[in-house]
């Protein structure tokens, strides 16, 4: 599944396609998260399948070698995680073991073996991962690394293990693969930019590419409501100058103009784009072909991040083919043509109706889409008017743009469909995509029985608020049993 998904990204023009973090040893497992691993020969075969799928389209393939340390729950392997100091393991009722010098030598051997397996799998870029509070960054952090031996002390002393790992990775893979270092430009407390800059400069001769970020993960991975495109720029702008090496970074880039500006201004040499590549795997190719209007832009809703946190296969609001490339044979740009002429009626022009009409129209069917509202988009049209959520309107806007290019699709607004009008139209197939609405009886995830509120109590749902209704009383109780984003 992952090989097919990454192969599609390579087909779409991405220059480098990476795995997410890739475990190097069973004492750092993240099951049931759907992560990668390079523990043994079986993993090499799996990784080689991904590399082959990426290479088929001329892109480079890479992996991020990962050891979680205190971030390793090890629910599957039941191994004891190792860390610079003994801390509770992530979301688990047990401790990590403080690494002695033998443990450190053993860890270095695990990392070197994983680098060799990455080379064996024909990968082009091998990441040394020293960010996001994983093991190498735990050694760098003064609060997590309280050691008094040669692996503790000043930042340069705490960086000893990182330097050893970089050197041994180069020794293992030679010039066959590039070495990328994923590292934060600040300390976990948000300070330390000056000493971190000295560290980056010192590490530069050992690194081919710097992949830089900051300690505040909410800035890197925040949703569009609170975190704007290119938010890391002020923090990382100095790295290229002080290291003299190519730099890549992320920032939920969706605008080609912003990407170009980052490169032209010398902030980065390469654009890192996880979420944008999920929303539109063909984004680079569309830029190259001058089809920027066809880019299916990420809306920053973070449904992809949610599925990562809930340990379930990846999904995307904008791209329904994501994760289904192998299982169902879906492709973000191509769809099987119709087998016979049919007229299809789609009732409801919300996100589901617009997507259904677009897909059916692309297949060549005659499609009529009708909605009683005066504007298309359904709920997302109202949501996108809420403060900070304008980007969500891209769900509607992109689909309307695509529908306008299909002469076989007709959209009718202010057209309520009744059984009589449906029968009169005489369509061969009817799709009802009228969506859903919030209940007023307060039933939800935990409140399973209807709640009988006091007489005279004005109960408003999110639908009411988005439609402009407001509470009549001064005192308001916010009741959230949805546990998602509404509250």
Where are these regions (language model features)?
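Flavin-dependent oxidoreductase catalytic cores
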Residues: 1-347, 351, 355-367, 375, ...
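Beta1-alpha1 glycine-rich phosphate/pyrophosphate-binding loop at the start
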Residues: 210, 346-410, 481-487
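Glycine-rich, anion-gripping cofactor-binding loops and their flanking helix/strand elements
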Residues: 224-236, 241, 384-397, 405, ...
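Short acidic loop-to-helix transition motifs that present clustered carboxylates
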Residues: 254-257, 278, 416-419, 465-468
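Glycine-rich dinucleotide-binding loop and its adjacent helix/turn
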Residues: 324-333, 337, 402-405, 411, ...
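NAD(P)H/NAD(P)+-dependent Rossmann-fold oxidoreductase cores
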Residues: 389-390, 404, 420-421, 434-435
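A conserved short coil-to-beta-strand element within the FAD-binding core of flavoproteins
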Residues: 412-425
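Glycine-/small-residue-rich beta->alpha transition segments that form the dinucleotide
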Residues: 427-429, 433-443
């Amino acid at each position: 599944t992952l090989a097919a998904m990454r192969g599609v990204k390579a087909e779409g023009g991405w220059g480098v396609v990476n795995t997410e973090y890739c475990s190097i040893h069973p004492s750092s497992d993240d099951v049931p998260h759907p992560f990668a691993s390079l523990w043994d020969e079986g993993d090499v075969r799996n990784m080689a399948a991904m590399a082959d799928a990426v290479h088929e389209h001329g892109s480079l393939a890479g992996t991020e070698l990962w050891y979680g340390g205190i971030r390793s729950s090890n629910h599957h392997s039941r191994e004891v995680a190792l860390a610079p100091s003994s801390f509770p393991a992530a979301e688990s009722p047990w401790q990590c073991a403080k690494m002695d010098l033998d443990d450190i030598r053993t860890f270095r051997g695990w990392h070197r073996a994983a680098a060799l397996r990455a080379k064996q799998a024909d990968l082009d870029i091998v990441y040394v991962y020293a960010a996001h509070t994983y093991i190498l960054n735990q050694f760098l952090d003064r609060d997590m690394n309280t050691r008094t031996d040669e692996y503790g002390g000043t930042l340069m002393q705490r960086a000893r293990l990182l330097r050893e790992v970089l050197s041994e990775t180069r020794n293992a893979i030679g010039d066959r693969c590039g070495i990328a270092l994923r590292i934060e430009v600040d300390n976990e407390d948000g300070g330390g930019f000056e000493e971190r800059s000295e560290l980056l400069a010192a590490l530069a001769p050992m690194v081919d590419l710097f992949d830089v970020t900051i300690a505040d993960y909410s800035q890197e991975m925040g949703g569009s409501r609170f975190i704007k495109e290119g938010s890391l720029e002020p923090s990382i702008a100095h790295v290229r100058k002080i290291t003299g090496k190519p730099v890549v970074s992320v920032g939920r880039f969706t605008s080609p103009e912003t990407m170009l500006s980052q490169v032209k201004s010398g902030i980065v040499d390469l654009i890192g784009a996880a979420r944008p590549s999920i929303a539109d795997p063909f984004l680079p190719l569309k830029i190259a072909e001058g089809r920027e209007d066809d880019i299916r832009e990420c809306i920053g809703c973070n449904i992809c991040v949610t599925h990562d946190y809930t340990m379930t296969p990846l999904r995307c609001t904008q791209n329904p083919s994501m994760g289904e490339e192998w299982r169902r044979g879906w492709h973000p740009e191509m769809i099987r043509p119709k087998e016979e002429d049919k007229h299809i009626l789609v009732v409801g022009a919300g996100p589901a109706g617009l997507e259904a009409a677009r897909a059916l129209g692309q297949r060549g069917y005659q499609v009529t889409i009708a909605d009683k509202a005066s504007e298309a988009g359904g709920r997302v049209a109202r949501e996108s008017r809420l403060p900070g959520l304008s980007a969500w309107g891209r769900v509607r806007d992109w689909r309307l743009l695509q529908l306008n290019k299909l002469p076989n699709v007709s959209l009718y607004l202010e057209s309520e469909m009744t059984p009589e009008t449906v029968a009169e139209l005489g369509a061969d197939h009817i799709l009802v995509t009228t969506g859903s609405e919030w209940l007023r009886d307060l039933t939800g995830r935990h409140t399973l029985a209807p709640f009988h509120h006091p007489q005279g109590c004005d109960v408003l749902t999110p639908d009411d608020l988005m439609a402009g209704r407001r509470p009549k009383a001064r005192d308001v109780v916010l009741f959230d049993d949805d546990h998602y984003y509404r509250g």
